[in-house]
A protein has these predicted regions:
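Metal-dependent enolase-superfamily TIM-barrel catalytic cores that perform enediolate-based chemistry
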Residues: 188-210
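Short beta-strand elements
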Residues: 49-59, 69-73
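Short, Gly/Pro- and small/polar-rich lid/capping loops
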Residues: 14-54
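Hydrophobic alpha-helical signal peptides and transmembrane signal-/tail-anchor segments
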Residues: 1-10
Length: 210
């Protein structure tokens, strides 16, 4: 997808006073030693690098907020392979760093669900394809699961920032009041399913334990 298509997607979307726009992102890697070995297939995990992301956003009033997200890059789980562990880890660290620029330079304004969905399912596949073609030419490509995990701390930080920007717990931000579109914009039921996502929002599915 081109940048013009990406921007058109959001320019044509309804908006609200709760919308945010990503300004910048910052990525750090945190080494973690596990308390006990974890086995994934034929490989054993005793340490992991966690990707920690901070995301700065701006609301429609010009106020800025920062959200945080973190996830372990469990190489053995997201990319099972005979390729040496070090090579796979280095590729994931590099790909994570590449995503920082992609998440910062998108121009989208909206709800975290809307921005995140387009980044994950429109931009991420293109970035992954380009990376595998240019950086992994002749080598085993980074799989889709690994790419999603690399993107997940950015998505977590985006949702965290949205809640902070609107002075609400994140899980209270998924109702009709805050979302510009319903779940039918993201989900399509199978042909034999008696399900309609029109008029439904994530808040209708999530159950908060108070």
């Amino acid at each position: 997808y081109s940048l013009s298509y990406f921007l058109f997607h959001f320019l044509a979307m309804p908006s609200s006073d709760f919308d945010i726009r990503i300004l910048s992102s910052d990525l750090k890697f945190v080494p973690v030693e596990t308390r006990m070995p974890l086995k994934f297939g034929t490989e054993v995990l005793t340490s992991v690098s966690c990707a920690r992301v901070s995301l700065c956003v701006r609301d429609r009033n010009g106020n800025e907020s920062v959200g945080w997200g973190e996830t372990p890059l469990s190489v053995q789980w997201v990319w099972p392979s005979v390729v040496p562990y070090g090579e796979r880890l280095d590729a994931l660290l590099d790909f994570c760093a590449k995503l920082s620029g992609e998440w910062s330079d998108n121009g989208a304004c909206g709800h975290a669900l809307e921005i995140g969905h387009s980044l994950l399912f429109e931009r991420l596949p293109r970035v992954l394809d380009s990376y595998n073609r240019e950086e992994r030419a002749g080598l085993e490509p980074i799989p889709w699961l690994a790419a999603l995990v690399c993107a997940s701390p950015y998505d977590l930080a985006l949702h965290d920032a949205y809640g902070i920007a609107n002075n609400l717990p994140t899980y209270q931000c998924y109702g009709e009041e805050h979302c510009n579109v319903d779940l039918s914009a993201f989900l399509e039921p199978s042909e034999d399913a008696d399900v309609d996502f029109s008029g439904k929002h994530a808040a209708d599915i999530l159950v908060l334990n108070r």
